[in-house]
A protein has these predicted regions:
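A short helix-loop
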Residues: 1-88, 170, 174-186
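Conserved phosphate-binding/catalytic loops in two-lobed NTP-binding clefts
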Residues: 121-122, 139-164
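A contiguous, well-structured pocket-lining segment that forms one wall/lid of small-molecule binding clefts
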Residues: 46-122, 131-145, 192-204
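Short glycine-/acidic-enriched loop or helix-start segments at secondary-structure transitions
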Residues: 3-6, 133-135, 161
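Active-site metal-binding loops of divalent metal-dependent hydrolases
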Residues: 127-128, 154
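Short, conserved micro-motifs enriched in small and acidic residues
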Residues: 21, 96-99, 155-160
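Glycine-rich phosphate-binding/hydrolytic loop that grips phosphoryl groups
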Residues: 152-190
Length: 204
Protein backbone atom coordinates (compact mmCIF):
# COMPACT_ATOMS: atom_id res chain seq x y z
CA UNK A 1 0.00 0.00 0.00
CA UNK A 2 1.54 3.29 -1.09
CA UNK A 3 0.47 6.89 -1.52
CA UNK A 4 2.12 8.45 -4.55
CA UNK A 5 2.13 11.86 -6.15
CA UNK A 6 2.06 11.24 -9.89
CA UNK A 7 4.00 13.98 -11.66
CA UNK A 8 4.06 12.39 -15.10
CA UNK A 9 4.62 9.09 -16.89
CA UNK A 10 7.15 7.19 -14.79
CA UNK A 11 7.63 10.17 -12.45
CA UNK A 12 6.40 9.49 -8.93
CA UNK A 13 7.00 10.91 -5.47
CA UNK A 14 6.24 8.50 -2.66
CA UNK A 15 4.30 10.15 0.14
CA UNK A 16 3.71 7.05 2.27
CA UNK A 17 4.25 3.30 2.28
CA UNK A 18 3.55 0.30 4.48
CA UNK A 19 6.09 -0.26 7.24
CA UNK A 20 5.06 -3.87 7.87
CA UNK A 21 2.12 -5.86 6.46
CA UNK A 22 0.38 -4.73 3.28
CA UNK A 23 -3.34 -4.08 3.55
CA UNK A 24 -4.10 -6.84 1.04
CA UNK A 25 -2.11 -9.27 3.16
CA UNK A 26 -4.13 -8.25 6.21
CA UNK A 27 -7.34 -9.06 4.33
CA UNK A 28 -5.95 -12.42 3.20
CA UNK A 29 -4.75 -13.36 6.69
CA UNK A 30 -8.09 -12.39 8.22
CA UNK A 31 -9.95 -14.52 5.69
CA UNK A 32 -7.65 -17.47 6.35
CA UNK A 33 -8.03 -17.12 10.12
CA UNK A 34 -11.81 -17.19 9.85
CA UNK A 35 -11.85 -19.95 7.22
CA UNK A 36 -13.48 -17.76 4.59
CA UNK A 37 -11.49 -19.04 1.63
CA UNK A 38 -9.43 -17.38 -1.07
CA UNK A 39 -9.14 -14.73 -2.41
CA UNK A 40 -9.39 -13.15 1.00
CA UNK A 41 -10.41 -9.62 0.07
CA UNK A 42 -13.77 -10.44 -1.54
CA UNK A 43 -14.46 -13.11 1.10
CA UNK A 44 -13.98 -10.64 3.95
CA UNK A 45 -16.06 -8.01 2.15
CA UNK A 46 -18.96 -10.43 1.65
CA UNK A 47 -18.93 -11.54 5.30
CA UNK A 48 -18.57 -7.95 6.55
CA UNK A 49 -21.74 -6.91 4.74
CA UNK A 50 -23.86 -8.63 7.41
CA UNK A 51 -21.85 -7.46 10.44
CA UNK A 52 -21.68 -4.45 12.73
CA UNK A 53 -18.56 -2.40 11.87
CA UNK A 54 -18.44 -0.82 15.33
CA UNK A 55 -18.92 -3.96 17.41
CA UNK A 56 -15.33 -5.13 17.95
CA UNK A 57 -12.78 -2.70 19.46
CA UNK A 58 -9.82 -2.85 17.10
CA UNK A 59 -6.80 -0.53 16.83
CA UNK A 60 -6.19 2.00 14.06
CA UNK A 61 -2.37 1.83 13.83
CA UNK A 62 -0.71 5.21 13.22
CA UNK A 63 -4.06 6.95 12.70
CA UNK A 64 -3.84 10.53 13.90
CA UNK A 65 -0.04 10.46 14.06
CA UNK A 66 2.37 12.68 12.18
CA UNK A 67 3.94 9.60 10.60
CA UNK A 68 2.36 9.45 7.11
CA UNK A 69 2.94 5.71 6.63
CA UNK A 70 0.69 2.67 7.03
CA UNK A 71 0.94 -0.19 9.52
CA UNK A 72 -1.37 -3.21 9.59
CA UNK A 73 0.59 -5.81 11.58
CA UNK A 74 -0.93 -4.70 14.89
CA UNK A 75 -4.43 -4.74 13.45
CA UNK A 76 -3.89 -8.24 12.10
CA UNK A 77 -2.73 -9.43 15.53
CA UNK A 78 -5.72 -7.78 17.21
CA UNK A 79 -8.09 -9.63 14.86
CA UNK A 80 -6.41 -12.91 15.82
CA UNK A 81 -6.84 -12.22 19.54
CA UNK A 82 -10.46 -11.14 19.09
CA UNK A 83 -11.30 -14.31 17.15
CA UNK A 84 -9.56 -16.54 19.67
CA UNK A 85 -11.58 -14.94 22.47
CA UNK A 86 -14.78 -16.35 21.01
CA UNK A 87 -16.71 -13.19 21.88
CA UNK A 88 -17.65 -12.08 18.39
CA UNK A 89 -19.16 -13.54 15.25
CA UNK A 90 -17.25 -13.74 11.99
CA UNK A 91 -19.60 -11.15 10.48
CA UNK A 92 -19.02 -8.60 13.24
CA UNK A 93 -15.27 -9.22 13.33
CA UNK A 94 -14.81 -8.85 9.57
CA UNK A 95 -17.01 -5.74 9.51
CA UNK A 96 -15.00 -4.20 12.35
CA UNK A 97 -11.72 -5.16 10.68
CA UNK A 98 -12.81 -3.65 7.37
CA UNK A 99 -13.88 -0.44 9.12
CA UNK A 100 -10.54 -0.20 10.93
CA UNK A 101 -8.75 -0.53 7.58
CA UNK A 102 -10.99 2.14 6.05
CA UNK A 103 -10.34 4.51 8.94
CA UNK A 104 -6.57 4.05 8.53
CA UNK A 105 -6.65 4.50 4.75
CA UNK A 106 -8.79 7.63 4.95
CA UNK A 107 -6.67 9.14 7.74
CA UNK A 108 -3.37 8.52 5.96
CA UNK A 109 -4.72 9.66 2.59
CA UNK A 110 -6.06 12.88 4.09
CA UNK A 111 -2.60 13.65 5.48
CA UNK A 112 -1.06 13.03 2.05
CA UNK A 113 -3.57 15.29 0.31
CA UNK A 114 -2.89 18.08 2.80
CA UNK A 115 0.86 17.68 2.26
CA UNK A 116 0.56 18.21 -1.51
CA UNK A 117 0.77 21.66 -3.01
CA UNK A 118 -2.01 21.38 -5.57
CA UNK A 119 -3.46 17.88 -5.98
CA UNK A 120 -5.66 17.47 -9.04
CA UNK A 121 -7.42 14.16 -8.32
CA UNK A 122 -7.51 11.20 -5.95
CA UNK A 123 -6.86 7.95 -7.79
CA UNK A 124 -7.20 4.53 -6.16
CA UNK A 125 -6.03 1.35 -7.87
CA UNK A 126 -4.95 -2.19 -7.12
CA UNK A 127 -6.67 -5.19 -5.58
CA UNK A 128 -8.01 -3.46 -2.48
CA UNK A 129 -9.62 -0.84 -4.73
CA UNK A 130 -12.19 -3.49 -5.64
CA UNK A 131 -13.62 -3.25 -2.10
CA UNK A 132 -16.79 -1.20 -2.41
CA UNK A 133 -16.70 0.14 1.15
CA UNK A 134 -13.12 1.34 0.74
CA UNK A 135 -13.95 2.96 -2.60
CA UNK A 136 -16.95 4.74 -1.11
CA UNK A 137 -14.94 6.06 1.85
CA UNK A 138 -12.14 7.36 -0.37
CA UNK A 139 -14.68 8.87 -2.78
CA UNK A 140 -16.18 10.74 0.19
CA UNK A 141 -12.71 11.96 1.18
CA UNK A 142 -12.09 13.18 -2.36
CA UNK A 143 -15.39 15.07 -2.33
CA UNK A 144 -14.55 16.66 1.03
CA UNK A 145 -11.18 17.71 -0.40
CA UNK A 146 -12.72 19.14 -3.57
CA UNK A 147 -11.02 16.54 -5.78
CA UNK A 148 -12.30 14.28 -8.55
CA UNK A 149 -12.26 10.60 -7.57
CA UNK A 150 -10.88 8.15 -10.12
CA UNK A 151 -10.95 4.36 -9.86
CA UNK A 152 -10.76 1.59 -12.47
CA UNK A 153 -13.69 -0.75 -13.08
CA UNK A 154 -13.92 -3.46 -10.43
CA UNK A 155 -12.97 -6.20 -12.88
CA UNK A 156 -9.67 -4.49 -13.67
CA UNK A 157 -8.60 -3.82 -10.07
CA UNK A 158 -7.05 -7.26 -9.63
CA UNK A 159 -5.69 -7.63 -13.18
CA UNK A 160 -1.94 -7.08 -12.85
CA UNK A 161 -1.41 -7.74 -16.55
CA UNK A 162 -3.75 -4.87 -17.44
CA UNK A 163 -1.94 -2.54 -15.03
CA UNK A 164 1.48 -3.42 -16.42
CA UNK A 165 0.27 -3.27 -20.00
CA UNK A 166 -1.30 0.16 -19.53
CA UNK A 167 1.83 1.50 -17.85
CA UNK A 168 3.86 0.18 -20.79
CA UNK A 169 1.52 1.80 -23.30
CA UNK A 170 1.84 5.15 -21.51
CA UNK A 171 5.63 4.88 -21.51
CA UNK A 172 5.69 3.95 -25.21
CA UNK A 173 3.47 6.90 -26.09
CA UNK A 174 5.83 9.19 -24.15
CA UNK A 175 8.86 7.80 -25.99
CA UNK A 176 10.22 6.12 -22.86
CA UNK A 177 11.50 2.86 -24.28
CA UNK A 178 14.28 0.42 -23.38
CA UNK A 179 16.15 -2.19 -25.36
CA UNK A 180 16.36 -5.78 -24.12
CA UNK A 181 19.84 -5.50 -22.62
CA UNK A 182 18.82 -4.31 -19.15
CA UNK A 183 18.93 -6.91 -16.33
CA UNK A 184 15.86 -8.19 -14.54
CA UNK A 185 15.12 -6.40 -11.27
CA UNK A 186 13.21 -8.27 -8.54
CA UNK A 187 12.21 -4.94 -6.98
CA UNK A 188 11.80 -1.71 -8.87
CA UNK A 189 10.79 1.21 -6.62
CA UNK A 190 8.34 3.64 -8.15
CA UNK A 191 10.23 6.43 -6.40
CA UNK A 192 13.95 5.55 -6.39
CA UNK A 193 14.72 8.65 -4.32
CA UNK A 194 12.32 7.79 -1.49
CA UNK A 195 13.88 7.38 1.92
CA UNK A 196 13.78 3.98 3.59
CA UNK A 197 11.28 3.72 6.41
CA UNK A 198 11.38 1.83 9.67
CA UNK A 199 10.10 -1.74 9.69
CA UNK A 200 9.73 -3.97 6.65
CA UNK A 201 8.40 -1.22 4.40
CA UNK A 202 11.84 -0.73 2.87
CA UNK A 203 10.62 -2.84 -0.05
CA UNK A 204 9.03 0.36 -1.38
Amino acid sequence: CQLLEVRGVGAYRRLATTIDDAVGEAFDKTAKLLGLGHPGGPAVERMAASGNPRSVPLPRPLAGSADPNFSFAGLKSAVLRAWQSGQWSAADLTASFQQAVIDCLVDRTRIAIEAMESPSALVVAGGVASNQAIRAALADLAAQSGLPFVAPPLWLCTDNAAMIGWAGAERLAAGLTDDLSFPARPRWPLDPDAQKVRGAGVKA
